């Protein structure tokens, strides 16, 4: 699991720099890159805290071993807290509604190829990690047991679909529209 964290951070560092490259045309790209850096760091911190909680509860960082040991600990508050920290951390990195506030400026002020790269890879990588943890480490039975889908993900997904679609519709800047549309698509 720790290797996943290192991979995410190395790839994130490069995207922060790429967003800042837009400063040649507009100095606001530096602020957008800084906000992206801060939000990405907060997300990474949440993710690492979740990994720490998992290690504390199970004594391993191997995904297969974690899945095996977590299956017996569905009611363990440490495991549930670890799951919450991992979801919030990856939610920030993936710009899932309502944790998406850094995304519109990062898309808008980054150079166009960078915005296209971000929309196609950087945020989707965090979604992959989140889904990998949900279905490989925690297992669907754990998700069903804690009621995450009905109580948290479904309401936010519905709000994201409508609120972000309306926000995208009201935008005049194409890249900002793409950012809001990306958040709405994550809701689907």
Spell out what each predicted region is.
Residues 1-2, 16-188:
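Hydrophobic transmembrane alpha-helices and their helix-loop junctions in integral membrane proteins
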Residues 13:
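Active-site-proximal acidic secondary-structure segment that organizes catalysis
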Residues 9:
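Short phosphate-coordinating micro-motif centered on Lys-Gly-acidic
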């Amino acid at each position: 699991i720790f290797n996943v964290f290192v991979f995410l951070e190395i790839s994130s560092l490069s995207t922060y720099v790429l967003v800042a490259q837009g400063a040649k045309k507009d100095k606001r790209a530096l602020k957008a890159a800084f906000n992206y850096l801060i939000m990405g760091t907060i997300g990474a911190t949440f993710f690492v805290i979740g990994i720490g909680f998992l290690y504390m509860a199970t004594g391993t960082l191997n995904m297969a071993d974690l899945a095996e040991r977590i299956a017996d600990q569905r009611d363990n508050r440490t495991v549930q807290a670890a799951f919450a920290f991992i979801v919030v951390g990856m939610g920030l990195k993936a710009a899932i509604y309502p944790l998406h506030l850094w995304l519109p400026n990062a898309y808008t002020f980054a150079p166009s190829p960078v915005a296209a790269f971000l929309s196609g890879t950087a945020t989707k990588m965090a979604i992959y990690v989140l889904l990998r943890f949900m279905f490989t480490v925690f297992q669907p039975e754990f998700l069903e047991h804690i009621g995450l889908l009905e109580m948290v993900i479904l309401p936010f997904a519905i709000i994201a679909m409508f609120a972000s679609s309306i926000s995208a519709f009201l935008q005049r800047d194409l890249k900002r529209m793409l950012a809001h549309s990306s958040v709405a698509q994550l809701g689907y």
